[in-house]
Every structure is written in C-alpha cells, then in structure tokens.
UniProtKB/Swiss-Prot annotation:
Protein name: Phospho-N-acetylmuramoyl-pentapeptide-transferase
Cofactor(s) annotated in UniProt: Mg(2+)
Presence of keyword Metal-binding: yes
Taxonomic source organism: Chlamydia pneumoniae
An annotated GO cellular component: plasma membrane
EC number(s) from the headed UniProt entry: 2.7.8.13
Pathway of action: Cell wall biogenesis; peptidoglycan biosynthesis
Pfam families, per database record: Glycos_transf_4
Cited function: Catalyzes the initial step of the lipid cycle reactions in the biosynthesis of the cell wall peptidoglycan: transfers peptidoglycan precursor phospho-MurNAc-pentapeptide from UDP-MurNAc-pentapeptide onto the lipid carrier undecaprenyl phosphate, yielding undecaprenyl-pyrophosphoryl-MurNAc-pentapeptide, known as lipid I.
Superkingdom field: Bacteria
Family: Belongs to the glycosyltransferase 4 family. MraY subfamily.
Subcellular location: Cell inner membrane
Ranges annotated as spanning the membrane: 13-33, 69-89, 91-111, 129-149, 165-185, 197-217, 228-248, 252-272, 278-298, 327-347
Any GO molecular function: metal ion binding
Length: 349
C-alpha cells in the first residue's frame, strides 16, 4: 500500500469524502481547457444526426462545432483521484481502475467510429451490447474476490425495508445475477440516452451519485461499501466539474466516452452495494429516459404510431417547444427528488 494522503486527513470519513469530490472537481476544471484543445486538434466534432426527429436537426445545428469525446476528461480525473484516495494494495482499487478503463475504452471507440463516418451512428447495437455484457460479467466474477466471500452477492437491499433480503437458494441466486446484469447494462445505456442536452447527464448523475453515497454509508454489511463511497464522491466531483464546460451553452460534450462510463460506473456501484432496487428510485430520471425509448419502439411496432413526439423523453419536451435550459433544470429537480426518495427509502425504519 502506498499512502498518498496523510492519515490525519482520513480521520473523518465525511471530510475525506468531501476532499475526494473536491480533488476530482479541481482536476476536471483544471484539465478541461487542454483536453478541449486536444479534441479540437483531433477534429472530434459532434455530428448532429436526428433522422427520426427532423425538428431537432434544426434545433441542434449550432452544436455541430462543439468538440465531443469529453468523457476522456472525466476518465482522467476519476483515475487520478482514485489513485490518490484509495489504497493501492487493495484488489478493489485496481478493479475500479480496470472498470473505468473498459467503459471509457468502449465509449471512445464508439465515438471514433461516429466521427470517422461523420454521422450519429457508431458501433452496431449488438456489438456494443456484447461488450457491455462482457464488462458486466467481469464485474460479477470479481465481486466474490472483492467481498471476500459469495454471501453478500445473494442479498438485496429493498426500498423502505430494514436490513437485507437474503436469497441463498438457487433460484434466488439466478435472480440476483440476472438483476445485477440488467442494472449494470441498463444504467450504462440509460445514461447514454440521457446525454442529449447541455448539462443534462452530468447534472442528473451528480444527484444520483450523491444519493448513492448515503446508501453506501448505510451499507455496513457490505465489505466494500466505504471504497464505493469514495468512488461515488469522486464521481460527484467529476460531474460537477464537467458542468463547468458542459453547462448551457456547452463548450464540450462527453460523448459515449463519458455517458457509458458514468452509467456503467453508477450501475456497478449499485450492484456492489446490492442496491439494484434502490437504483430504480434514485436513478428515476434514467429509468424515465430509457423507458420512453422502449415505449416509443413498442408503440411504433404495435400501433404503427408514436407515443412521444420524439424520444428519449427530453427530446419530446424539446419538440414541444420548451427551452433547453428549462428542460434540463426540471430534470435536475426530478433527479434531486429521486435521490431524496432513495435516501428516505434507505433510512426508513
């Protein structure tokens, strides 16, 4: 173990969590300008391609020159912060590093294909899905080593229920594994869908990650809970720092590099805390965004007409004529409420 932080700074958990978030925030803001210049030199521009919602082509035409791939900024800041605040001698620290690298690598490759083709389509959905399954499977395989046993893997934290629900029988184990896969892959894709307006994904993720810090602090039965809290604190700082450049009007987009990274990390943290059911509450914005896309597809196939003017949900409101800033602010408020409900669900007695 290589201690990079004096022990007196770690005497108070809340203080050290706050410093972790501040470290990532400062790193993100400090590195933002050089990263943007580098992306511009590489010609990483966002190509607006909304073939099913023609009106959005016009609404987003001014965004065409904004550099994308800004998720690399989130990746660098998160990695640096975790290496500072987490002990190098623990398996879990390097697990988080590998996990971040996998999601950032997948998103970066997807962004590169989009830029090369100069359109809104990157990797084929089935290919991206297969890689996401592989990363999620890696997470589940690593969990027993992180926990030190398999027992926590067969438990679940249920909203508004004290303690943990144990499912040690074989059907319960299958359910736990399936739910974990859905949580990780679903959250990664849901945040990817949410990233469609300036500051939307970063802002809503800040509240969601903050909510899960409280979940981690209440998860005394989970061996890895404290390390997860540090990761989530770093995530909050990274998202707030990214808003410095991504807030309206955006100077930088996170691209799939950022959205797949943020979603995959949040989903993985929820699984590590055995809080997949709490994720549905705290991540209510992401559930609504992904749900709107699923319902839209089903409606088009079964009813031959759209349920929403355009999906995901934020584009529906944009299509109705609501200003982008108002939509983003209202989604932030909804995310704040969801985080509050999630915290209440954990504190309930």
């Amino acid at each position: 173990m290589i201690p990079l932080i004096p022990m007196f700074l770690k005497q108070s958990l809340f203080f050290s969590l706050a410093l972790t978030g501040m470290t990532t925030l400062v790193l993100t803001v400090s590195l933002g300008v050089p990263v943007m210049k580098w992306l511009k030199r590489k010609n990483y521009r966002d190509y607006i391609h909304k073939e099913y919602c023609e009106k959005l082509e016009m609404l987003h035409k001014d965004k065409a020159e904004v550099p994308t791939g800004g998720g690399v900024l989130l990746f660098i800041s998160l990695i640096a912060s975790l290496l500072v605040w987490l002990p190098w001698g623990k398996f879990s620290t390097w697990f988080f590093i590998i996990l971040l690298t996998c999601y950032a690598g997948l998103g970066w490759y997807d962004d590169r294909i989009k830029i090369k083709r100069k359109q809104g389509h990157g990797l084929k959905a089935k290919h991206k899905f297969m890689v996401q399954i592989a990363i999620a499977a890696f997470t589940l395989i690593a969990l027993p080593y992180i926990y030190g046993s398999t027992e926590p893997l067969w438990t679940l934290k249920i909203p508004f229920m004290e303690g943990m629900l144990s499912l040690p029988f074989w059907l319960g184990k299958v359910f736990c594994l399936g739910l974990a896969l859905v949580a990780i892959i679903g959250t990664s894709n849901a945040v990817n869908l949410t990233d469609g307006l300036d500051g939307l994904a970063a802002g809503t993720m800040s509240f969601a990650a903050l909510g899960f810090i409280f979940v981690a602090l209440r998860s005394s039965t989970i061996p890895i809970a404290q390390d997860v809290a540090y990761v989530l604190a770093a995530l909050v700082g990274a998202c707030i720092g990214f808003l410095w450049y991504n807030g309206f009007p955006a100077q930088l987009f996170m691209g799939d590099t950022g959205s797949l990274l943020l979603g995959g990390l949040l989903g993985s943290c929820a699984v590590m805390l055995r809080a997949e059911c709490i994720l549905v509450v705290i991540g209510g914005v992401f559930v609504a965004e992904a749900g709107s896309v699923i319902l839209q597809v089903l409606s088009c196939r079964l009813r031959k007409k759209r349920l929403f003017l355009c999906s995901p949900l934020h584009h529906h409101y944009e299509y109705q004529g609501l200003p982008e800033t108002k939509i983003v602010m209202r989604f932030w408020i909804f995310s704040f409420v969801c985080a509050g409900l999630g915290i209440a669900a954990v504190l309930w007695r």
